[in-house]
């Protein structure tokens, strides 16, 4: 269903890089991601890429938090608005909320310290609706009408 997940954020001069990593790590299992860094003057660009079978698993924490925080309807709207012409799903998360362990969408990419940019690539562009239905299904009174099977959260559970 999902072939790749790419997370991108910037570390500003006023920020502690470890806190930025912690913010991202509160929402995503960074052990599943390959990390890339790039110096850009005073900024440092951090990119985390997860490809293959673990890509879906890497969204497990977000999957759980959307349900715990009861924000499936808002998430579904943001995900649908974030569908790109190439068939990926692009959305922004508030870095400060992530540091506190919460999902908060930074609409339009607006976040005081810059957002965590998330891009989810379905295996096929036509699978984009399946990905949205899995991550943020339609609801009635805030409860999912149906649930697509939740992924196992750890690689060892695949055995």
UniProtKB/Swiss-Prot annotation:
Task: Show the taxonomic lineage.
Answer: Archaea, Methanobacteriati, Methanobacteriota, Methanomada group, Methanopyri
Family named by the database record: Belongs to the UPF0201 family.
Protein name per Swiss-Prot or TrEMBL:
UPF0201 protein MK0399
Pfam families the record matches: RNA_binding
The signal sequence is none
Superkingdom assignment:
Archaea
Q: Which residues cross the membrane?
A: none
């Amino acid at each position: 269903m999902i072939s790749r997940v790419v997370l991108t954020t910037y570390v500003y001069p006023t920020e502690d890089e470890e806190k930025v990593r912690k913010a991202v790590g509160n929402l995503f299992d960074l052990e599943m991601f390959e990390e890339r860094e790039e110096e850009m003057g005073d900024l440092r660009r951090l990119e985390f890429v997860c490809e293959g079978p673990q890509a879906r698993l890497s969204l497990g924490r977000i999957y759980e938090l959307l349900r715990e925080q009861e924000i499936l309807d808002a998430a579904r709207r943001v995900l649908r608005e974030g569908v790109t012409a190439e068939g990926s799903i692009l959305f922004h998360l508030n870095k400060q909320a992530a540091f506190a362990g919460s999902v908060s969408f930074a609409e339009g990419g607006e976040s005081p310290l810059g957002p965590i940019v998330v891009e989810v690539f379905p295996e096929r562009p036509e699978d984009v609706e399946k990905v949205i239905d899995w991550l943020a299904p339609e609801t009635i009174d805030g409860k999912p009408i149906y649930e697509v099977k939740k992924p196992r959260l750890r690689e060892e559970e695949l055995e």
